[in-house]
């Protein structure tokens, strides 16, 4: 799975929203691993030229997730999910809807990579909170 985040424009921090696995094919994982990590990972060794970070979370990323591999956020993905829910693990929009909980995308599915966008174009915490509040199942 790949951790996906939203952006806090006030601080530049990225808060996790979900882990995406659905919609990704084996071929995609191989290509993504080669592109981001510089080659296949074996025996937990860091390939030469790897973007892999030695420890996580990546700088500026706020999450309750524990990931085996971390790299600097630089790719924008378009994802779709069933709905948004409050989460003790994911940290996007903490304080905007609930004092301690972030907002998470349930049943996320990868749609496509967005090479035309940068991290500065990622969904903001305010946008995620607005989409959460707009759901019909959320009490107003």
Could you describe each region identified by the protein language model?
Residues 1-9:
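Catalytic nucleophile-His microenvironment captured as a short glycine-rich beta-strand/loop
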């Amino acid at each position: 799975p790949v951790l996906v985040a939203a952006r806090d424009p006030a601080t530049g921090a990225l808060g996790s929203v979900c882990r995406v696995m659905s919609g990704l094919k084996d071929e995609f994982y191989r290509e993504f691993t080669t592109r981001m990590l510089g080659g296949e990972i074996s025996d937990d060794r860091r390939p030469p030229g790897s973007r892999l970070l030695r420890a996580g979370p990546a700088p500026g990323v706020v999450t309750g997730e524990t990931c085996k591999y971390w790299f600097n956020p630089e790719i924008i993905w378009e994802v779709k999910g069933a709905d948004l829910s409050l989460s003790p693990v994911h940290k996007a929009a903490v304080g905007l809807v609930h004092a301690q909980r972030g907002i998470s995308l349930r049943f996320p599915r990868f749609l496509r990579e967005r090479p035309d966008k940068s991290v500065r174009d990622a969904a903001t915490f305010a946008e995620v909170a607005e989409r959460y509040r707009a759901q019909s199942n959320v009490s107003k």
